[in-house]
Amino acid sequence: MRPAILALSIFLLAASAPAVDREAAKASYRQGNEFFDQSRFADAAAAYGHAIEQDPQFLEAYYNRALSDEMVDRQKAIADWRQFADLAANSPDFKYQAGQGSARIQILQMLPTYPDALQPSHYVSSAADYYAEIAETSESERWTTYPIKVAIGNVPEANWAQGAREAFSIWKEMLPLELTAEPEEADIRFNWDPDQNMEGGEVGEEMDWVQFRREGNELTGRKVAFISVDLSRRWSKDEMRAIVLHEMGHALGIKGHSLSKGDIMYFQVQEKNRQVRVPGVYYPFAWKTLVSKPSQRDLNTLIRLYNTPGVVLRMK
């Protein structure tokens, strides 16, 4: 090729490349961060996309877009993480984040197809969530087969049984649960032993165990959640419903507590009325008005827990 023609080709190629507008990209990126912090994940992903259009080498925007799309569309998130990992592999400053991206791709690909109630489309941005408060203790606590089978068992008092059944029915309206009379078939089981000891004045507790079975030459394990309630107190039906709602929230994956008194995973502090203790909290709690069902924040937290493959913070 003649030198003049080669020079012209290079000029035309450079002219056709998109112009980089770093200031505009930074403005779009800041907007994306604001949306992300407001739990407006679809808007955040779009804003980060604009930042990438304005600066195709803006690695932080690729990273945060992938995080946002985890709460929008799993396949988009996988594509985003691949794009980020490919670009970051050539940048020494982003070597660790590139590894994070590759790991998240693997986890996202292994996650099952969730029931409709756990899809990101049911996340209500205006209600937000308390995922950051429970994420580290709740990671890998997702149920992967549905419906989740629950055995309430033989409840010693009729009003307690009614409260427990009401709690089950409330959660069943939101998630695919199935009541079973066979404890060995259940994923979530209740212990109504009146002689059980609760530590530190706790009203109830939830614990997870792995149950092993031998099938031929193979040993298989499955997670089982056990819920216990302090039966030494004279609970009303509504109090039992609130206790079971709360403990089932733990069993479904929320291994922590909300800081908002409107959530079922928080018990309101009061000076009067009945006082109880919540596991892991070292001061008395009491009910003045009982939360009657999981809040949208409770549901949002479950949705985010099930769709987010581990705890990472967005880039600043």
List each model region and its residues.
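Disordered inhibitory propeptide/activation segment of secreted metzincin zinc metalloprotease zymogens
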Residues: 99-159, 210, 294, 304-316
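Canonical tetratricopeptide repeat
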Residues: 30, 64, 97, 101-104
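Metzincin-family zinc-dependent endopeptidase catalytic domain
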Residues: 158-261, 269-276
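Alpha-helical tetratricopeptide repeat
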Residues: 21-36, 63
